[in-house]
């Protein structure tokens, strides 16, 4: 038994290497089961899918495999693969990341967060709402990871003021206590950048240890306070995931949808920043509301019986302390600086120009230029370029006439060195890998072959198809990266829509949004992992809370797709640009036609 256990440990330690070597061999039969070109493309896609799900290679390195495998296997020439890594969609996302970097550099996000918390009050239910609203708003523009990493220390400091240091110590695991505590004292720690978080997490996964909470049997008040603490911590990563869906640049799957739409349906121009915001923002608000009600109900944020009535004076003192912590941290930021004002104005300009470029319901400012020349990427890059030369100190005409004034160069709002350090460049490669995969599916005929295999699903009602898609993808993304998940599923959804003869967006949008609805496990998303690493949450806490969150998300998404999304994207019709693609699918190569016809 000892030898067997030792062997198992060695196999586990070498699991990544074994996956790297054995999976390519295990997938070889696919090359002989399908038509040659389609089989080779499916081989590459399944290989990348396994590598992504197991993280045998870093996600961004796996995304580079099409550059190697597509040319070698005769699927696509290198001249067609490499440009997929720098489409205008990638530059739109890059501009959003750079804008987020400037906001973080000037601490504007912390000022916004503390100001909102000062406005909502410090009663538990209202504070949970304030945390969720603030986190979701920040996540619309910053990454989900950065928003969570910033808000958790603020939440912990407020909770320590409400309930005292004694309560938090009991909630921390005995082992590794120093490594899991999120906040020391009542001060707020330095927030790690997303680049630092991704770098630290790529080396391996933290052990998901469930530390038993030492709860006095005779203290219902203690239990209530601990539940409030859990409610605060669990609401932050959930609202970050929800908020990221509201804007096109909020999370990577949204932009992957845009890029793959342009690949599969080149004439499709209905999805842009403005139209997506009009669809997704109301959905985000609805989900936040029901999510807040559920979390507040489950963790006692709306219950005042017991400790509120018996200890009203004590509670008033605790709330005063919490207010003092928020106000002190806000005052520590000092008066608003010129650099903060400049970044805020550029951020507002960034959002307004993206929204108004082509909002669909009225002509946008892009109509002033030649059709098709100005995209969202042009707007984004134009605004963020200003960040690198606009001065961070208020310019003065007196300086030009004061020859004794120092002649040091003015620091810009954002330096390129800082952008290099804080922008997660690996996500750009991950996006490119998804676009290259979509291009390979289209050029090889694999998309058409998949469409032929989906023929039995032609009689599934579209409403049921949407529900099934959201449930399956929401479940799948609990165990795999949301970016990898949507890269794998979108080509299938596009072909399924053609077979069902429904608007492609009717299936592709819910598939994309449901990728962000990963609430049940710590490993589902980086925000979940950050919250779990504080040591205050158990896996069962996330499962019981996240299960209903997933269900509510699926139902609300189905509601949105069958109500206001119908008007925004004209989902009730089968568009001409999809008809063109359907005609291309029908005109299959001879080898592919034989295989497809046999399945019909």
Swiss-Prot record:
Record bears the keyword Transmembrane: yes
Looking at the record's lineage, which domain of life comes first?
Answer: Eukaryota
Q: Which membrane topology term applies here? A: Multi-pass membrane protein
Q: Where found?
A: Cell membrane
- Name a single GO biological process: citrate transport
Pull the Cytoplasmic topological domain ranges from the record: 1-16, 77-82, 159-229, 300-336, 394-422, 444-461, 527-546
Record key words, sorted? Cell membrane, Glycoprotein, Ion transport, Membrane, Sodium, Sodium transport, Symport, Transmembrane, Transmembrane helix, Transport
Intramembrane region positions read 423-443
List GO terms (cellular component aspect).
basolateral plasma membrane; membrane; plasma membrane
The UniProt entry, under CDD domains, shows: SLC13_permease
Biophysicochemical property: pH dependence = Optimum pH is 7.5.
One matching Pfam family is Na_sulph_symp
Give this protein's Gene Ontology molecular function annotations: alpha-ketoglutarate transmembrane transporter activity; citrate transmembrane transporter activity; dicarboxylic acid transmembrane transporter activity; glutathione transmembrane transporter activity; high-affinity sodium:dicarboxylate symporter activity; L-aspartate transmembrane transporter activity; organic acid:sodium symporter activity; sodium:dicarboxylate symporter activity
How the protein is activated or inhibited is described as: Li(+) decreases succinate transport in the presence of Na(+).
Catalysed reaction, written as an equation: succinate(out) + 3 Na(+)(out) = succinate(in) + 3 Na(+)(in); 2-oxoglutarate(out) + 3 Na(+)(out) = 2-oxoglutarate(in) + 3 Na(+)(in); N-acetyl-L-aspartate(out) + 3 Na(+)(out) = N-acetyl-L-aspartate(in) + 3 Na(+)(in); glutarate(out) + 3 Na(+)(out) = glutarate(in) + 3 Na(+)(in)
Glycosylation (residues): 584, 594
Q: In which tissues is it expressed?
A: Highly expressed in proximal parts of straight tubules in the kidney. Detected in placenta, in brain, and in liver. Strongly expressed within the meningeal layers of supporting tissue that surround the brain and relatively weakly expressed throughout the cerebral cortex, hippocampus, and cerebellum.
- Ranges of the Extracellular topological domain: 38-55, 104-137, 251-278, 358-372, 483-505, 568-600
Report the leader peptide range: none
Indicate yes or no for the key word Transport: yes
Q: TM spans, by residue?
A: 17-37, 56-76, 83-103, 138-158, 230-250, 279-299, 337-357, 373-393, 462-482, 506-526, 547-567
Q: Say what the protein does.
A: High-affinity sodium-dicarboxylate cotransporter that accepts a range of substrates with 4-6 carbon atoms, such as the citric acid cycle intermediates succinate and alpha-ketoglutarate (2-oxoglutarate), as well as other compounds including N-acetyl-L-aspartate. Transports the dicarboxylate into the cell with a probable stoichiometry of 3 Na(+) for 1 divalent dicarboxylate, rendering the process electrogenic. Can transport citrate in a Na(+)-dependent manner, recognizing the divalent form of citrate rather than the trivalent form which is normally found in blood.
Q: Which family does it belong to?
A: Belongs to the SLC13A/DASS transporter (TC 2.A.47) family. NADC subfamily.
- Kindly provide the name given to this protein in its UniProt entry: Na(+)/dicarboxylate cotransporter 3
| Organism annotation | Rattus norvegicus (Rat)
Q: What is the lineage of its organism?
A: Eukaryota, Metazoa, Chordata, Craniata, Vertebrata
Q: Which gene encodes it?
A: Slc13a3
